[in-house]
């Protein structure tokens, strides 16, 4: 609601977290699905074709649920360049919402790039239910890129929208609890061990899948 006028389009990249469609519909937006490539990397050509005069926002999720894909610096940089071009063509602001509850859960030395370095109109949304292993505890934060010209206006909208959620707002105690834990995360060694065991055994059995780079999901071909 902080970004959309009723009926404006939100691009989501398939495969995606299934609840995105309900969030968008609940806030008056129109869903536009764009498939990723076979390895689940961004299909920039398909994204470019999907962006039109009614597009307002793209949602990305990295590391991805359900694929475990981590978008690279190059992909994010190219996406930022594409959006800059499209903003000039369409004469309208285009925003990226980066959903990153798994940002601290990545494997094999892979680091999740900061969206703020590559996309000017970006909003980072995260939840500590994953990186602090607090399943179902919806405590997190939203952050707006300092490069965004209308950052103050967007933040005001986000704050107001959060207030309208009422009883689901984080209590003061939870806010105090997570503040000193911003640089902490669960020990991901157990997650990586489980990923390796499942990946190695399932591929040995003949299943085909892209090896997850983060999160805790496997997405085999059916």
Regions found by a protein language model. Name each.
Residues 25, 32, 41-54, 66, ...:
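Active-site pre-lysine segment of PLP-dependent enzymes
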Residues 16-20:
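Conserved coil-to-alpha-helix start sites within the AMP-binding
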Residues 59-61, 95-100, 126, 211, ...:
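Short beta-strand segments
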């Amino acid at each position: 609601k902080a970004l959309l006028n009723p009926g404006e389009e939100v691009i989501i990249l398939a495969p995606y977290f299934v609840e995105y469609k309900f969030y968008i519909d609940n806030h008056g937006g129109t869903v536009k699905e764009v498939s990723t490539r076979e390895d689940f990397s961004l299909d920039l050509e398909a994204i470019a074709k999907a962006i039109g005069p009614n597009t307002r926002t793209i949602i990305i999720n990295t590391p991805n649920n359900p694929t475990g894909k981590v978008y690279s610096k190059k992909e994010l940089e190219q996406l930022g360049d594409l959006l800059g071009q499209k903003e000039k063509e369409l004469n309208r602001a285009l925003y990226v919402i980066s959903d990153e509850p798994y940002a601290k859960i990545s494997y094999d030395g892979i680091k999740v790039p900061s969206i703020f370095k590559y996309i000017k109109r970006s909003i980072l949304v995260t939840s500590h239910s994953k990186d602090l292993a607090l399943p179902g505890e919806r405590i997190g934060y939203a952050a707006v890129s300092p490069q965004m010209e209308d950052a103050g206006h967007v933040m005001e909208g986000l704050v107001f929208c959060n207030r309208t959620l009422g009883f689901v707002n984080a209590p003061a105690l939870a806010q105090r609890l997570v503040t000193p834990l911003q640089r902490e995360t669960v020990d991901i060694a157990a997650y990586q061990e489980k990923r390796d065991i499942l990946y190695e055994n399932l591929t040995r059995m003949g299943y085909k899948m892209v090896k997850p780079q983060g999160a805790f999901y496997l997405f085999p071909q059916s």
